[in-house]
Structure formats: structure tokens, C-alpha cells
């Protein structure tokens, strides 16, 4: 199997980053024709505010199709911490959380059957929610569709399509409107992988607190109707001013109850799917590799990074170095690697990372 590519951070580049995974042909070709109004790094959400998005259902639908072509960015994050009791200068004690290791591995490439073909090389599909799903449907609070456990409105005759939801959003007379679009990653057993990684860390005799998570970045988009109130709520300095003057105490309830929200459209990116095997049965096929295959590829590199107390991203170079004996590294690098491996043996023997 091909090793995953190196990834760079482009979020803060002065030159706009051109996504190599954005399609150049097909439904999403040419990219978005509008720029985001705001990018919130804290919540990893991109906000759009354009009058065409809340008045032209075809333009809104085309924009959602284009947004669906851009991939989410799933990660595996392995983090270990312990607490230490330290004595301060005033002779009092305090508990401090110490990070022993914090490593991330990007999984975006595993969404593609052929990463060189962004149009047809991935199993992605634009969906609308089902009638039984409890989401906001132009409402303030989540609800099921009318006739399926939800109250009010005309009973749904079938499940509304993406195009229908675009028409309903644009036709709504609500003064404040918001449509949430999500990119979801499916097709892997995350619970299985979490247990495998927890066991891997435990095998190093680590005695601290382990956290295994699978965050998905570049997954959330919010579209607001173009009006002065929404421009103000998305402007950072106004938000800060409202916090400092405590005006948010009055503004937050107003915005919450006045804003009608739609959480009815999402893009599904499948890492695996069931396909007929030609004998009348169904078999699971993976876009790139299975959870077990990925674990076998990365297990040694992850365990080595944990013992080295690494913090940061791992890439294909770590996979290659993990399979390289220390005596092959040569020179000073080989001496350092041998020393680190010796420390790892000691840690495994006596345990490490416990609270104190």
C-alpha cells in the first residue's frame, strides 16, 4: 500500500492556497464562486454570507454541490497526560497537567480510491436528512418531520431532496436564517481502532491518562442570509465588544430565538462500502485500506513516538524510520536513536507517566 503523503499547514499562508483535491471537471469544477465571510479557527467553521445564497435556490444548490467536492480532514489523535503536584514560591501546592505525548496522523488520503482523480476517485454523495432524524428544519429547536413525530406544518409526502431544502430556505420569510452543511466521514469502525490504539499505548507501560480521538476538520459550513444583524454577529470586534460590555446577555437570547436554522443537507464521504461480490453475497470494500491494515502500518511508529514523548504530526517518514534498526541510522543520529530506544526499554520495565 502507498504511504500517506506529507501534509503542510496552509491556513496562514499569505498566498491563497489552491486545494489540489478540488475537482477541475464535473459538477464541482471551477471551485466556489464566492469567498467565505469568515473562517473561525477555534470552531473550525467556515461562514458564508451572500445575498444570492438566500434568494436563489439554484445558486444555493450549486454552491452545496461545490462544497461537497471538498474533502473533510479526519485525524487520529493520541494524547497522554499526567498531573503533578508542585510547590509554589508562596509555599502552597498546585496541581499541574503535564502533556507526555500528543501526536496526530492525518487520514484524508484514505478517503480516496484514486487521489489523483478528485472527481471520481472518492465515494462521496450529497444527502438530505430523513424524516425521522431529529434536526432543525427551519426551526429553532431540533424536530422530526411533521407526521413523523414532529409538530406543525404540512405532513411530508416523502423525503425532501437537497433541491427542495434549498427552495424552502430561500422562500422562508424569516428575518434571520442559517443553513448548516456538514461533511461526514463514514465506513470505519472507530471504536475498534480506539481500543487497538489504547492497547498499544498501554503496552508501553504508560500509567498516565490516555485520550484517543478522531477529530474531523474542514467539516462544517454555515450559511447566513445577508442582513446587517448577521454581519454584526459574525464580525469579531463586535463580538468582543458585546462580551466585554455584557451586552451578550441580552443579544444571545434574541439571536437564538429569532434565527431559523436548517440542518438538513450534508455530504457523506465513505471510507468503505458494501458491494456485491458476484456470487449473490455482499462484501466490504475499502476506498484505500481497512482499519486493521492502517493499524498494522502505523503501530510501530506510533508506539515509538509515544516512548519518545513526541508532540506534533507523524508522516510517512516516521513509518520508515520505525522499521529501521538503530545501527543502520549511522553516526550521531544512530547514537541518539539507540539512546531513545534504551530509555523506552527502561520505561516499559518500570512504568512511566503516572500522577505524582
Regions found by a protein language model. Give the residues of each.
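Intrinsically disordered, low-complexity regulatory segments in eukaryotic proteins
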Residues: 1-163, 167, 181, 356
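Extended amphipathic alpha-helical regions
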Residues: 100-345, 351
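Short amphipathic alpha-helical segments
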Residues: 350-356
Amino acid at each position: 500500500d502507498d504511504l500517506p503523503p506529507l501534509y503542510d499547514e496552509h491556513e496562514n499562508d499569505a498566498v491563497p492556497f489552491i486545494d489540489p483535491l478540488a475537482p477541475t471537471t464535473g459538477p464541482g469544477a471551477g471551485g466556489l464562486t464566492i469567498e467565505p465571510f469568515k473562517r473561525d479557527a477555534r470552531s473550525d467553521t467556515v461562514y458564508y454570507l451572500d445575498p444570492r445564497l438566500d434568494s436563489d435556490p439554484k445558486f444555493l444548490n450549486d454552491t452545496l454541490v461545490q462544497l461537497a467536492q471538498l474533502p473533510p480532514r479526519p485525524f487520529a489523535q493520541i494524547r497522554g497526560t499526567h498531573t503533578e503536584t508542585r510547590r509554589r514560591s508562596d509555599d502552597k501546592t498546585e496541581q499541574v497537567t503535564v502533556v507526555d505525548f500528543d501526536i496526530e496522523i492525518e487520514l484524508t488520503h484514505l478517503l480516496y480510491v484514486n487521489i489523483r482523480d478528485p472527481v471520481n476517485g472518492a465515494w462521496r454523495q450529497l444527502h438530505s436528512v430523513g424524516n425521522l432524524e431529529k434536526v432543525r428544519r427551519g426551526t429553532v429547536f431540533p424536530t422530526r418531520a411533521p407526521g413523523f413525530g414532529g409538530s406543525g406544518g404540512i405532513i411530508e409526502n416523502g423525503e425532501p431532496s437537497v433541491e427542495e431544502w434549498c427552495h424552502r430556505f430561500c422562500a422562508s420569510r424569516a428575518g434571520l436564517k442559517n443553513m448548516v452543511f456538514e461533511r461526514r466521514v463514514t465506513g470505519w469502525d472507530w471504536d475498534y481502532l480506539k481500543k487497538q490504539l489504547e492497547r498499544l499505548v498501554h503496552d508501553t507501560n504508560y500509567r498516565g491518562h490516555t485520550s484517543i480521538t478522531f477529530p474531523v476538520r474542514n467539516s462544517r459550513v454555515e450559511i447566513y442570509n445577508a442582513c446587517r444583524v448577521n454581519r454584526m454577529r459574525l464580525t469579531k470586534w463586535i463580538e468582543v465588544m458585546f462580551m466585554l460590555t455584557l451586552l451578550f446577555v441580552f443579544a444571545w437570547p434574541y439571536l437564538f430565538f429569532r434565527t431559523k436554522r436548517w440542518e438538513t443537507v450534508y455530504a457523506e464521504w465513505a471510507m468503505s462500502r458494501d458491494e456485491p461480490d458476484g456470487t449473490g453475497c455482499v462484501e466490504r470494500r475499502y476506498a484505500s485500506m481497512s482499519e486493521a491494515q492502517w493499524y498494522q502500518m502505523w503501530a510501530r511508529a506510533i508506539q515509538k513516538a509515544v516512548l519518545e514523548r513526541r508532540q506534533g504530526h507523524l508522516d510517512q517518514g516516521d513509518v520508515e524510520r520505525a522499521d529501521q534498526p538503530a545501527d543502520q541510522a549511522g553516526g550521531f543520529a544512530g547514537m541518539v536513536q539507540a539512546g531513545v530506544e534504551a530509555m523506552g526499554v527502561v520505561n516499559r520495565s518500570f512504568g512511566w507517566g503516572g500522577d505524582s
